[in-house]
């Protein structure tokens, strides 16, 4: 089989060996520099196990005593390459879901931690954040994870406030194999956020070939987070962009293309501000469905679609559900949204279409899209 890994130029093969200057402005609800703060210890990991070992060591003081929340802030640069595992999984899609998941767990670590992939690195394992805070995950290329039937998420944020998921590439196959539990678990989610994971920012990620992109809440009783999704590029994905259960979602400057099931699904009385995005070739791009009640509401502002007459121009279609549902097929706002509690400067939807693919994902030196680039 032809390799799925695109050759990388010599310039991009330079590892991100030094942490960037600390920054707490994520363009969203999260305000964190992760581990990149005063007193941070920087380490390099060449494998998944190295990351595990480095985090374990950071839990202990100089005397080997465990410190609650971690002994020191931590910046880990991951230089490993698992292209061979990714390509093998891509060649045997239906052989992955029943395997055990692979992942790094960041549990009860509140001192601050950043995991940043070196350019040219890749991972066939997930990053699972639980009961932690001030965590940043950047420039990680994660794909075709095993364990779809065993909660094998690429990135999972569980009971963890102040998390920033930024400039990653997350990918699998938008396909369902026969015989999987619930007929829905060939691969698990790209980014699931649940529990007490308030103030999270998901930005500049390139997410493609994923059936279930991401939860905002694990059940109808798991509600109430504030999450920002901005400058993400979604292509050939099925649904959950996100599946929002309650709380607030601010989605701005995202590019949604080739959406095969549904896009932003605002449920359980959630409120969404959907601003300056570009939608094309999308089924049910904004909807509230599957619960049959407690429909969420949205404010539509500055998107490329402004009226139903635009649907044919951008290949937007709508479907019904067996339960009561609400689609944005009149393309009007259905509610209100509170004043956004952070500074942000969205570019136009047209600029998102034209420029965002050059900024989202890995190997972009964490560059951000500004109005200057739109001229």
UniProtKB/Swiss-Prot annotation:
Its EC number is 4.2.2.2. Disulfide bonds join 94-177, 351-374. Its cofactor is Ca(2+). It holds the Pfam family Pectate_lyase_4. InterPro entries: Pec_lyase, Pectin_lyas_fold, Pectin_lyase_fold/virulence, PEL. It catalyses: Eliminative cleavage of (1->4)-alpha-D-galacturonan to give oligosaccharides with 4-deoxy-alpha-D-galact-4-enuronosyl groups at their non-reducing ends. Belongs to the polysaccharide lyase 1 family. PLADES subfamily. The keyword DNA damage does not apply. Involved in maceration and soft-rotting of plant tissue. Coiled coil: none annotated. This is Pectate lyase C. Binds 1 Ca(2+) ion per subunit. Ca(2+) binds at residues 151, 153, 188, 192. GO terms for cellular component: extracellular region. It is found in: Secreted. Residues 1-22 form the signal peptide. Pathway: Glycan metabolism; pectin degradation; 2-dehydro-3-deoxy-D-gluconate from pectin: step 2/5. The active site is at 240. The keyword Electron transport does not apply. The gene is pelC. It comes from the Bacteria. GO terms for biological process: pectin catabolic process. PANTHER family: PECTATE LYASE 18-RELATED, PECTATE LYASE 21-RELATED. One of its GO terms (molecular function) is pectate lyase activity. Keywords: Calcium, Disulfide bond, Lyase, Metal-binding, Secreted, Signal, Virulence. The lineage of its organism: Bacteria, Pseudomonadati, Pseudomonadota, Gammaproteobacteria, Enterobacterales.
């Amino acid at each position: 089989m032809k390799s799925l890994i695109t050759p990388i130029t010599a310039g991009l093969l330079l590892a991100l060996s030094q942490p960037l200057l600390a920054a707490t402005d994520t363009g969203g609800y999260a305000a964190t520099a992760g581990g990149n703060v005063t007193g941070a210890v920087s380490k390099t990991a060449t494998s998944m196990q190295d990351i595990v070992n480095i985090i374990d060591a950071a839990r202990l003081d100089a005397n080997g005593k465990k410190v609650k929340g971690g002994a020191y802030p931590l910046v880990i640069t991951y230089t490993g390459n698992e292209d061979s595992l990714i390509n093998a999984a891509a060649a045997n899609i239906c052989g992955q879901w029943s395997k055990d998941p692979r992942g790094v767990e960041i549990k009860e670590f509140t001192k601050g931690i950043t995991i940043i992939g070196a350019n040219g690195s890749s991972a066939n394992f997930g990053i699972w954040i639980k009961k932690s805070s001030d965590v940043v995950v950047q420039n990680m290329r994660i794909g075709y994870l095993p364990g779809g039937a065993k909660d094998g998420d690429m990135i999972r944020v569980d009971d963890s406030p102040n998390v920033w998921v930024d400039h990653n590439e997350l990918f699998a196959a938008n396909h369902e194999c026969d015989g999987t539990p619930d007929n829905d678990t060939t691969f698990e989610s790209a980014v699931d956020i649940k529990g007490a994971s308030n103030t999270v920012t998901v930005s500049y990620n390139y997410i493609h070939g994923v059936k279930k992109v991401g939860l905002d809440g694990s059940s109808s009783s798991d509600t109430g987070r504030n999450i920002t999704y901005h400058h993400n590029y979604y292509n050939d994905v099925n649904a959950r962009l996100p599946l929002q259960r309650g709380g607030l979602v601010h989605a701005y400057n995202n590019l949604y293309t080739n959406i095969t099931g549904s896009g932003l699904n605002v449920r359980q009385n959630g409120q969404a501000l959907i601003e300056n995005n570009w939608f094309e070739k999308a089924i049910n791009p904004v909807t509230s469905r599957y619960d049959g009640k407690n429909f969420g509401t949205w404010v539509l502002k500055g998107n490329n679609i402004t009226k139903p007459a635009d649907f044919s121009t951008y290949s937007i279609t709508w479907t019904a559900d067996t339960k009561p549902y609400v689609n944005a097929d009149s393309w009007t706002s259905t509610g209100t949204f509170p004043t956004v509690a952070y500074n942000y400067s969205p570019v136009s939807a047209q600029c998102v279409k034209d420029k965002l693919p050059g900024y989202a994902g890995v190997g972009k030196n964490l560059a951000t899209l500004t109005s200057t680039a739109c001229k």
